[in-house]
């Protein structure tokens, strides 16, 4: 395996510095969910304490897994990341499995982020409904308006265009967006610390509550503790409900290997960049969730009524400035998520095309800009489904993002163990980290796919199981069609 570290003959341009790469990873990690999910999932499922513990544990697991990525990237400094690692270590069939699920892990996040644009505008403009004009229809109970479709489509095309005209230009925009996002969240966090309106007593029930049962009983704040998660089983369920989606929450730090061919710096910096991106991501998730509960004495009622609790809390703390902070922060999160996953998805498809897993068309690199133009165009076209289908329908696919990411983590950890053994250069620490990462990858997959009694809100919903079967079926058809073009060992 000594030839693995040789320079690639890639036609992609080396234009990414460490700050660019951090911004890409962090921008992928933090999207719409960090601002929307405190009210939609985190506070009810896990509360402040359960979410904080789950996010910290999830970050620690991701850091453990990141050591495997840091070891493998210098070995295979090519676009494709986990797909490339798997192909070289375990052959073409395993590589197809890994690549196929990574595609859904990355690409579904682009249209899903685009559907948050309408929610952002709705939350900020109050009763004005500025985007609710023109024809409209509903899919799975989600209303879709022409105005929202037009804005989301324009943003998807613009972000895609920036990716096409040069990775450096896109990376500069990404760096600005990610930096501004951190500033907004940190400012809101400090405001909560110094404000008399944010109180620890407001955070109860700290482990969350049974939202469905409470809503069915028309519960109020006076009797919400009846439905609170209590006891060992309740607390464990609260933590695992959020911990199980850690692969989804942190998916994006692994976008770094996808752009490895475009780094203009030493690969020795990969581990530190990944760790910083994960830590910043953990801070944003935990901070937004904690601030939302601390600032609102009646947050359970607001959660049950479907309010955007992060926005309401920011407004309670800082008035109109708080509203501007959240609006700016979530906009940066959405745009950086779209930008980052465009890059990760297109580089993965570019790599798969080069190995015969996708048609050669996906591997075309623009001679002027040095970017995988056709792969990016494909990502744009697929992502335009977001404004058309709406959040609820896409949500069934997005649930698979965590599965796809977990499969990528599994193969990266396994490839690390195999490569370290073959090359004889892996430390005991690295091997232990890889084994732990391998184990947690399996745990994440089990938690999401297999219903476990007593653990509510952890596994897939019915629609997501159906979408998983559909994606596997499409993969089998595609595999049978493309298999003869695969290159690599059996």
Named regions from a protein language model:
Residues 101-119, 245-263, 285, 320-360, ...:
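Membrane-helix boundary/coupling elements in multi-pass transport proteins
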Residues 121, 147-210, 274-278, 401-412, ...:
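Membrane-interface loop-to-helix entry segments
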Residues 16-35, 152-158, 213-295, 322-342:
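Hydrophobic, membrane-embedded alpha-helices of multi-pass small-molecule transporters
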Residues 119-126, 179-224, 290-296, 413-423, ...:
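Hydrophobic alpha-helical segments and their helix-loop junctions in multi-pass secondary transporters
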Residues 84-86, 91, 123-133, 209-230, ...:
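TM-loop-TM module centered on a large, flexible mid-protein loop between adjacent transmembrane helices
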Residues 13, 37-142, 147, 277-282, ...:
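Extracellular loop-to-transmembrane helix junctions
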């Amino acid at each position: 395996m000594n030839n693995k570290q040789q320079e690639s003959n890639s036609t992609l341009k080396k234009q990414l510095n460490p700050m660019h790469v951090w911004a890409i990873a962090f921008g992928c990690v933090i999207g719409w969910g960090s601002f929307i999910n405190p009210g939609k999932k985190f506070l009810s499922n896990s509360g402040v304490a359960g979410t904080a513990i789950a996010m910290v544990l999830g970050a620690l697991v991701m850091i453990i897994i990141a050591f495997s990525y840091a070891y493998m990237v210098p070995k295979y400094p090519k676009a494709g990341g986990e797909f490339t690692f798997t192909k070289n270590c375990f052959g073409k069939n395993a590589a197809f499995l890994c690549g196929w699920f990574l595609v859904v892990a990355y690409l579904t996040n682009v249209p899903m982020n685009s559907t948050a644009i309408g929610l952002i505008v709705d939350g900020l403009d109050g009763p004005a409904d500025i985007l609710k004009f023109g024809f409209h229809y509903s899919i799975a109970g989600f209303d879709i308006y022409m105005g929202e479709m037009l804005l989301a489509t324009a943003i998807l095309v613009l972000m895609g265009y920036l990716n096409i005209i040069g990775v450096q230009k896109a990376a500069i925009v990404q760096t600005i967006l990610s930096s501004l996002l951190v500033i907004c969240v940190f400012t809101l966090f400090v405001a909560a610390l110094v404000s008399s309106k944010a109180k620890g007593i407001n955070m109860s029930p700290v482990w969350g509550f049974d939202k469905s049962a409470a809503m069915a009983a028309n519960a109020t704040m006076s009797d919400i503790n009846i439905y609170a998660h209590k006891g060992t089983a309740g607390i464990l369920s609260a933590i695992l409900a959020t911990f199980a989606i850690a692969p989804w929450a942190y998916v994006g730090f692994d976008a770094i290997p996808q752009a490895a061919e475009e780094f203009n710096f030493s690969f020795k910096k990969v581990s530190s960049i990944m760790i910083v991106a994960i830590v910043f991501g953990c801070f944003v998730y935990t901070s937004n969730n904690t601030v939302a509960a601390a600032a609102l004495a009646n947050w359970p009622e607001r959660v049950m009524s479907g309010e955007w609790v992060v926005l309401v809390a920011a407004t309670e703390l800082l008035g109109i400035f708080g509203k501007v902070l959240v609006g700016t922060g979530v906009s940066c999160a959405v745009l950086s998520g779209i930008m980052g996953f465009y890059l990760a998805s297109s580089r993965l498809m570019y790599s798969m095309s080069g190995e015969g897993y996708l048609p050669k068309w996906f591997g075309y690199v623009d001679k002027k800009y040095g970017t995988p133009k056709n792969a990016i165009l494909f990502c744009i076209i697929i992502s335009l489904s977001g404004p058309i289908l709406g959040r609820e329908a896409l949500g069934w696919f997005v649930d698979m993002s965590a599965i796809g990411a977990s499969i990528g983590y599994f193969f990266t950890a396994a490839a690390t163990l195999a490569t370290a053994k073959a090359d004889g250069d892996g430390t005991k620490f690295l091997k232990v980290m890889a084994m732990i990462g391998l184990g947690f990858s399996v745990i994440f997959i089990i938690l999401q796919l297999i219903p476990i009694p007593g653990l509510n809100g952890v596994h897939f919903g019915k629609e997501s199981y159906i979408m998983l079967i559909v994606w596997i079926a499409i993969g089998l058809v595609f595999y049978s069609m493309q298999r003869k073009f695969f290159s690599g060992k059996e």
